[in-house]
Amino acid sequence: MSGGRFDFDDGGAYCGGWEGGKAHGHGLCTGPKGQGEYSGSWNFGFEVAGVYTWPSGNTFEGYWSQGKRHGLGIETKGRWLYKGEWTHGFKGRYGIRQSSSSGAKYEGTWNNGLQDGYGTETYADGGTYQGQFTNGMRHGYGVRQSVPYGMAVVVRSPLRTSLSSLRSEHSNGTVAPDSPASPASDGPALPSPAIPRGGFALSLLANAEAAARAPKGGGLFQRGALLGKLRRAESRTSVGSQRSRVSFLKSDLSSGASDAASTASLGEAAEGADEAAPFEADIDATTTETYMGEWKNDKRSGFGVSERSSGLRYEGEWLDNLRHGYGCTTLPDGHREEGKYRHNVLVKDTKRRMLQLKSNKVRQKVEHSVEGAQRAAAIARQKAEIAASRTSHAKAKAEAAEQAALAANQESNIARTLARELAPDFYQPGPEYQKRRLLQEILENSESLLEPPDRGAGAAGLPQPPRESPQLHERETPRPEGGSPSPAGTPPQPKRPRPGVSKDGLLSPGAWNGEPSGEGSRSVTPSEGAGRRSPARPATERMAIEALQAPPAPSREPEVALYQGYHSYAVRTTPPEPPPFEDQPEPEVSGSESAPSSPATAPLQAPTLRGPEPARETPAKLEPKPIIPKAEPRAKARKTEARGLTKAGAKKKARKEAALAAEAEVEVEEVPNTILICMVILLNIGLAILFVHLLT
């Protein structure tokens, strides 16, 4: 057997034993352009046992066959280490993959480089999952066991603390940069809708988001009838109504975070808070949680049982980590909630109804779901036992892989020694790659030590101190987007105080004249025009405008509040009296001054009250009569002025009578509405009594 150095056209080189024109014996080979290095034993051009080093510093130590990793070996890839069997270049059949930084690992069976079959996942906080896997995801039956609540990892990213590498990892073993858990991401992690803890899916805080998303049952009083003012009230006396708005099993995170299902999301108002079950803040630090049942695509879906050591338990159907379907929830105080769930919200319960047949059907479906959940839990326990046996077998293969790695390192050392003897100037890049990797790890570790405690804990997935655990779900949960605009809407009122704006936000007489209200009325332009023309008006007209700005009578406030239900703004039923125009010298001036006042009042009047408007134009047409005779004596002028004054007084009385008639019409219109409401209510009560009588 001869040996020496051989340079290839692609930039690679080989230095070692040679026979029959192929590499044979021991030797060292570099890849194209000198990238990558293999050192070990050869068999007529194919690797047998040795060490392959990538430019990133990742290594494989083990056996090869036909140019692919095959047999036993150890792969070091970033912070992850795989020890076990290899089949034609892929991980499997049995092996262990673990993280050198967090301690998370998977032990079980593999297929095509992904977890497939049975295995055990151990998470960074110590929680475990034992069961079935398919294509790298939990799929089938399995058991998820958490650690005590005080020790559980606070998951601040949608990816799981242990398995983020299995489905969102680069080839060099680093977490994807778009992941919030990536240590290379700049700035603090974005707050998630909830602060979940590993393995805890049960929650006793109200879930406003799911309650708003779940449609409620419709009825006669919910279809917009009776002006939309009557709604079906929800009972607060039964267990179902008190607990239906409570989110027991909330998890709105991605599939990668399903093992760390979220607890309560946004909280709820104080309504019924004192009557609800114990809050999440009261959970004991030693409480644990277990889920046994079906998994689909890495999520709790199908039938399953989830229970806590404190006594909280749910048996029934699941969908995407949410209670969805029929099931039964048992609270720590012994109360039971049975019925149909939709997105964690109870939409149908088994309490006594008028239609007993319907409630019996719901109860039968609940019993069927509970039986299915119990069967699924029993199957999951059996699958967990099988996974435990596969785990022990994978551990044995991992120990054998360690021995194979030692043999591969020995072959690599022999090949390096031979290469130095044959060609002392031959460059061996493998040691340089490993040195770079060690320096990079040292730098990353030093940076992680210099990071603030809160950021380091969020990025590395380390558990938070137990003292913060009970209040994390309440204090660190961000407010909903709809609750923050209050600061933006309140400042305009103290900045522009108007005497015509009431505390209730209704328009007062000052606003009827065109003044802008605190809510941003559109009558800003007419009010400015009126203010510019006010100096040119006579004293009598200014006095009339000041009279309109007086505070309204207490008896007319209910009218404004009543018509606010029909319109998006407050409306006064009685139109404001226009200023007198008798003293105007010319009819053209009076017409031009009366025009700007109409746009300010038109948007604020009810549509039914436009009838009396033509009466306002009559004074402008009749005013020129006392002005035409200019050459007559003063006595005749006095007579005409007296006649004009009497006519003006009569017109004022006519306008007042028209306004009173309009008010009477509005009152008459109000009475049929109340009568109609009362009649419909009495009719419904009578029909209900008749229906119950027929059933009994």
From Swiss-Prot:
A GO CC term attached to the entry: junctional membrane complex
InterPro entries: Junctophilin, MORN
Gene3D superfamilies: Histone H3 K4-specific methyltransferase SET7/9 N-terminal domain
Chain intervals for the UniProt region annotation (Disordered): 164-193, 250-282, 448-652
Stretches with biased composition (Low complexity): 176-189, 251-280, 587-603
Bias type Basic and acidic residues, positions: 470-479, 613-624, 631-644
Family classification: Belongs to the junctophilin family.
Domain notes: The MORN (membrane occupation and recognition nexus) repeats contribute to the plasma membrane binding, by interacting with phospholipids. Has affinity for phosphatidylserine, and phosphorylated phosphatidylinositols including PtdIns3P, PtdIns4P, PtdIns5P, PtdIns(3,5)P2 and PtdIns(3,4,5)P3.
Name of the protein: Junctophilin-2
Species assigned in the record: Homo sapiens (Human)
